[in-house]
Structures are given as C-alpha cells and as structure tokens.
Amino acid sequence: MRSKTFSVLSSCLLLIATVQGQLSGSVGPSTSISDKKAVKTCNVLDYGATNDNKTDVGQPIMDAFEDCGSGGVIYIPDGDYLIQEWVSLENGTAFAIQLDGVIYRNGTTTSQGYMFGISGGSDFELYSSTSKGAIQGSGYLYHMNGEFTAPRLLHISDVSHWSVHDIALVDAPMFHFVIDDASNGEVYNMAIRGGNSGGLDGIDVSGDNIWIHDVMVTNKDECVTVKTGSHNFQIENIYCNWSGGCAMGSLGSGTNVSNIVYRNIYTWNSNQMYMIKSNGGDGEVSNLLFENFIGHGNAYSLDLDSEWSSMDTVDGDGIFYRNITFKNWKGTETDGESRPSIRVICPEATPCTDITIEDVDLWTEEGDSETYVCKNAFGSGACLKSDSSSTATYATTTTVTSAPSGYSATTMAADLTSAFGTDASIPIPTIPTSFYPGATPYSALAGSS
C-alpha cells in the first residue's frame, strides 16, 4: 500500500518513464487503496473462509466480490488458504484484492483454466501489503506424472487501469501470469518461480500502455514475453534467473506490434537474452528498443529468427520487421560458435529494415571464437548490410576470433546455482530488492514501509 507522499513520487517517476520510454499515458489504478478502503473492506473470513489450508477460499472470494466489486477492498489476511473453486471476477470497478496470505491449489482438483481470473472492468489492484502474499500452484503434482496441460495461475483480461504488485506466483501447473488485451496496467515487485520445464511461462502479455518493472522470473520458458497485439510497453529491471529468457512471439498471421521498450534486462543461465520468433506469417513489428542487457551462461543471446524451427510454418511472406535497435549489451553465452551470439534472420520476401546493433559486446564461454549470422537484414552494426534499397537477398556469417573490449559484465548475488525440478514442491521466494545491477527499483516493497 502506498502513502500519499509515495504516490506523488511514483507519479513523478512515471512521468519520467513516459518521456524516456514507450508508455502512451498513465498506468495503474485510478483510485488509491485508502480511497477504496474508505468505501468498504470485505474480509474473506467473514464470508466463510478459514486460514487452515483445508477450507475452500475460492467461493468466499467471489462472495466478497459481490459486496466489494463495485468499490472496496477484498481482504485475505495472513495465513494459509486452500483454493478448490477457481476465482472468476468480471467487470469490477474501483476494487482491490489485498492478498496477505498464501493461497494453495487443492492438489486433488482436476479443473483446468485459470485459478485466479480478472476480466473486464477498470480501476483494479491485486497486491500484498506485506510483500509476502503468494499463490502456490503445486504444479509438481502434475509434472511428476508427465502432465503439463494443466491449470494456469493468474489471468488479467480486458481490464483498464490496474496493477499487480508485491506478490509471488509459484509452481504453476502451466502458465504463471497471462495478461491478455489489457490496458494502462502496471506490474512490479514480483517474484515468479516455476519448475524447470517448457510450458511454464512467467509473464505473457498483450494489450496497450503497460509498464512491467522490477520482476524476477525462474522457470524454463518465457521470462517476460510480448505477444501480438501489443503496443506502448515499457519493460525494465527484469531478472531472468535461470529461465527461458525474454522474447517476442511466437508471431504468425496478422501480427501487429509497435512501440516496445525493454531496458535493464539481466539474464542468467537461460535459453536466450532475447528472442523474436516467427516462421512465415504476415503483419508488422516496428519501433522496438532493447537497451542495457546483461547475460551470462545463456544458450543464445541476440536472436531475431524469422525461420524459427520450433513452430510450424504459417502461411504468408513473412513479418515485416523495421526500426529495431539493440543497444549496450554485455556478457557471455555458453558457446558462441555453435550458436551465434548475434543472429538476425529475416524473410526473403520482406527483409528487415532500419535495424541498429550498437555497442553489443558479447563473448563465448567455451572455445576461442564466436559467430554473427545475418540474413536479409539491413541497417548498421555486426553483420548487417547497409543498403536496404537493394533487391538482392543475402546471407552472411562473420567469425570473431578475439573478445570484444567491454564485454565483461557483473553478476547478481542471487543468481541460482541450480534449477528447481518438476518432482518436488518449490519454495515460495522472497521478493528481491534488486533486479538489475546498479538499478534502483522504482517502488519500494510494500512490506518495507
């Protein structure tokens, strides 16, 4: 919960962020928590919930929403709660959920879908006043049996002016947090921790005017990934701590993405520092900035791949990528010769234009050389060709045999030394206070005040 003074400071910081980044307007709830509490507080304990991890809290939350969903705060006090009935809250206005307890998925339920879904409406906030609230999905109970088509944890859909902050999402049976066609939102001060397997995405996001910052993700798939239909995003201070890494896609027919900034992204022992992935399709991706990236121990680094083999080819001449800048990248990857540290692969029928690779200094951890691969990509830097007016297609590989100056980069104290498996319970993490070397989080943890 933010004080009035802090709200003013946050607004000033947001103004700075809007000027420096790609946000198109204000983000977050329209009214404060104190204003919402002044209307009404609905304690789930008064609606039949008990914090004994035995009695379903899902229905009490939905019953509390009937009284507080048009103005007020649904309060889930400290303690352990069992969820059996999935929560679906639709078209609420001027309400919040204060999750100070921990919600555990009932391990015997076979329900699919989203455990916690908020759809429609506006002026919404999900937060923990102690920064200790969490949703524990106990996904390992599925994964240990080889099941990965399973419930998801949190879904924000078609909501305007909202925020999610100061909570942890843990061990999702499938995806952790999906933001779908939402607008004017803010996500911050979160820890997401999942099993070491594909399909356990951290944050997947689409919509307009969304600020995601100060988030740590551990899993084996998407860290913070932008989907088609995304515009005016600012994503910064992201800690992919043994993850799949951040990405865009996969993109197919009718792709429409513009005005996206990723800044201050730290990636440790993940699949990639950043990947844009498509295979065929059509549409346009434009006006992207990827600035201040640090990586260590990753399989791939800078990877724009319009021939991504992990997806089926989609009908179309390929997506048109234009005006994309990669700037100030440092660090290492595991094997820069067998997996190029810079790879920009663009469609033959729709070459990429206005691509800039500037101060991208990466080096291999194995061997003594690395490669850059470019195909049908025009701009400046690395192996890119400069003449986009040419109709000739091309493909080139450049071998680098000496480490670039300035590639060395710091590590983070919380870098994991091993992954979390898929056959045992995953502990709930403490939300960190640092998400990128030298960068101060925009908002102090709610529990620190």
Curated annotation (Swiss-Prot):
Residues with glycosylation annotation: 53, 91, 106, 241, 256, 323
Record keyword Ribonucleoprotein present: no
Catalytic residues as annotated in Swiss-Prot or TrEMBL: 221, 296
Superkingdom, natural source: Eukaryota
Endpoints of the signal sequence: 1-21
One Pfam family linked to the record: Glyco_hydro_28
Listed EC numbers: 3.2.1.171
Function of the protein: Pectinolytic enzymes consist of four classes of enzymes: pectine lyase, polygalacturonase, pectin methylesterase and rhamnogalacturonase. Hydrolyzes alpha-D-galacturonopyranosyl-(1,2)-alpha-L-rhamnopyranosyl linkages in the backbone of the hairy regions of pectins.
Stated name of the protein: Probable rhamnogalacturonase E
